[in-house]
Amino acid sequence: MGLTVNSTGKGAADKELIIRKPSQDAKVVALAGNPNVGKSTVFNGLTGLNQHTGNWPGKTVANAQGICSTSRHSYVLVDIPGTYSLMAHSAEEEVARNFICFGGADEVVVVCDATCLERNLNLVLQTIEICDHVIVCVNLLDEAKRKHIRVDLEELENRLGVPVVGAVARERRSLDSLLAVMDDVADGKGGNRTPVVISYPE
């Protein structure tokens, strides 16, 4: 059985996170990913010091929001806790699952580790099933290169049916392409891709 909003648990969205938008038309972007993929480095690279930290409603789990802008859009980035799956088994995973499913984000960026990409694809595929506007950011391409691992970003994009961007988040300029794709998705210019559909046995 595939993931649906209803299958994630009744009442999961009872306590909503307050999103601090700089303007009414600012886009909300969830930053998701497995632990230790450089997700917070992407967050810090995009938002700099323009961020706010606190706790998720009813949780001791830390929450970080930050603002970044392009010439086309303003964004509120929400750095959600690292998780391997939307099937929650801890408070952190529950927070991540609930925000992806119920948080109303305009886009979800799933950050992946280029050195162990296969392990990251479970969360990517689950997120594609739930959300309409998903971007995959393959981070740590420099480390992958050192390990003689080559990631074919174009083929990955073709297979997944969603935009795929490569990055070395420690180098801020490499995040410009991610911002450009975020703008395109916000403007409805994501192309004519059809997101991958997972078939499950009866």
Residue spans of the language-model regions?
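Conserved C-terminal guanine-recognition region of P-loop GTPase G domains, centered on the G4
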Residues: 66-72, 95-165
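Conserved nucleotide-binding/hydrolysis micro-motifs of P-loop NTPases
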Residues: 49, 58, 82-83, 114-118, ...
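Canonical P-loop GTPase G-domain recognition
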Residues: 142-196
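Conserved G1/Walker A P-loop phosphate-binding module
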Residues: 2-88, 103, 107
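Helical mechanochemical/support elements of P-loop NTPase systems and associated helical scaffolds
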Residues: 57, 61, 76, 88, ...
